[in-house]
């Protein structure tokens, strides 16, 4: 692939790791953020120590606070900002951009109040004459591993296969490989909803439960994620792929996962306020839990694990009581759809 110029919006852990992948592939990378100290650190010291204490970035990766300068003559834009500000940043991009580009996003969540997928938000806020079909970049991927060039395989999903293939070629190299998919709803909901199950899996660990319980929450969590996704129009097959079960495994079993760590702390009795303050990073699973719970209620989708986590986070239900309620639900067949 010829050299491309890519704007990466969001200098967090995943945005930084993906910037390095793009730079390794010979592309010009511009990171945009709104914290001058962080941007100066990236440009001066080639580090982003809030996320990666021992990683030195290539000096060709340049960071900006000026959005217009960041977007000038770019071929593609990658959104990697928190879910709650995606719409705001998309509005800023629409007001600044003066030519058509490929639009990608690698964030995982649902808009808290509208319950909308992030690709829908980008479609609503960025006019068609300025963008391609949206491409979702998602899958089992810890930034801490990608940044040290550990093997990573994820998915590029777009309604337009050719656009997904462009992104596949843009990112893929000897340690980072993308597969394409046209099921945007499936890939996007899988990436968002697995964060909820990861919070639950972490809570089980914090409470001292063993591998049996952790395997159960992942398997049954996947079942209810699939039910909601299919109700929204996704293919059930997507949830057996990298962006589905793959991402659920990596997020629901690893200390690298901030959602798993948040759940672990909840299980050990820490308050949500203390957890968020101590982590200093966005825990997407918290806001996504409310959005998914409300969406499931609206669509009539059975999601007992999500409901239990919602009750714990937003209504102060004791975690052990929530587990007891799940274990005493009416008996069902494993493949029962409701």
Curated annotation (Swiss-Prot):
EC top class named in words: oxidoreductase
Residue numbers binding NADPH: 13-14, 108, 143, 258, 282, 284
Top-rank taxon: Bacteria
Disulfide links within the chain: none
Places the protein is found: Cytoplasm
GO molecular function: glycerol-3-phosphate dehydrogenase [NAD(P)+] activity; NAD binding
PROSITE patterns from the UniProt entry: NAD_G3PDH
Chief location bin: cytoplasm
Entries under Pfam families matching the protein: NAD_Gly3P_dh_C (PF07479), NAD_Gly3P_dh_N (PF01210)
GO cellular component entries: cytosol
Keywords per UniProt: Cytoplasm, Lipid biosynthesis, Lipid metabolism, NAD, NADP, Nucleotide-binding, Oxidoreductase, Phospholipid biosynthesis, Phospholipid metabolism
EC number: 1.1.1.94
InterPro entries: 6-PGluconate_DH-like_C_sf, 6PGD_dom2, G3P_DH_NAD-dep, G3P_DH_NAD-dep_C, G3P_DH_NAD-dep_N, NAD(P)-bd_dom_sf
Gene3D superfamilies: N-(1-d-carboxylethyl)-l-norvaline Dehydrogenase, domain 2, NAD(P)-binding Rossmann-like Domain
Keyword Heme found: no
Active site: 194
Annotated catalysed reactions: sn-glycerol 3-phosphate + NAD(+) = dihydroxyacetone phosphate + NADH + H(+); sn-glycerol 3-phosphate + NADP(+) = dihydroxyacetone phosphate + NADPH + H(+)
Function text: Catalyzes the reduction of the glycolytic intermediate dihydroxyacetone phosphate (DHAP) to sn-glycerol 3-phosphate (G3P), the key precursor for phospholipid synthesis.
Family: Belongs to the NAD-dependent glycerol-3-phosphate dehydrogenase family.
Protein name: Glycerol-3-phosphate dehydrogenase [NAD(P)+]
The species this protein was found in: Streptococcus pneumoniae (strain CGSP14)
Name of the gene this protein is made from: gpsA
